[in-house]
Amino acid sequence: LDINGKEVSLSDLKGKYVYIDIWATWCGPCNAEIPHLKKLEKQFEGRNICFVSISSDRSREVWEKFVKNRKLGGIQLHMGNDRKFMKEICCYGIPHFLLIDRDGNFINANMLRPSDPKTREILKGFERI
């Protein structure tokens, strides 16, 4: 569910490249990536790349407060106690980043972090496609 309680599916994002961030409010390295992720979101705003952040926080209340206080952008989702998605993609630690193509297929299931300068260049390459 997103920050407004609306269900969001990957099929809703078809036609766009999707950069996914799996994170949690309590995760120091995750928090360190937030300013870099915000910068990427701003640079690619209105383009064919969508940014989705999926929180693995157990408490929806803690997550909602954090998202609102930090004014996080992109599509903000909360997985709660359901770790099915993380198991399916073999995600055993956070932060974890993924890149999905316009048809919903994985391009990279272990994508670089937003703080890595190569990430911007990779995403820029998809603008031309």
Predicted regions and their residues:
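A short beta-strand-turn-helix
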Residues: 1-18
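Flexible loop/turn segments at secondary-structure boundaries
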Residues: 7-8, 26-29, 58-62, 84-86, ...
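Active-site acidic short loop of glycosyltransferases
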Residues: 14-16, 46, 72, 91
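Conserved redox-active cysteine motifs that mediate thiol-disulfide chemistry
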Residues: 14, 22-39
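Structural microenvironment flanking redox-active thiols in thiol-disulfide oxidoreductases
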Residues: 32-70, 81-87, 121
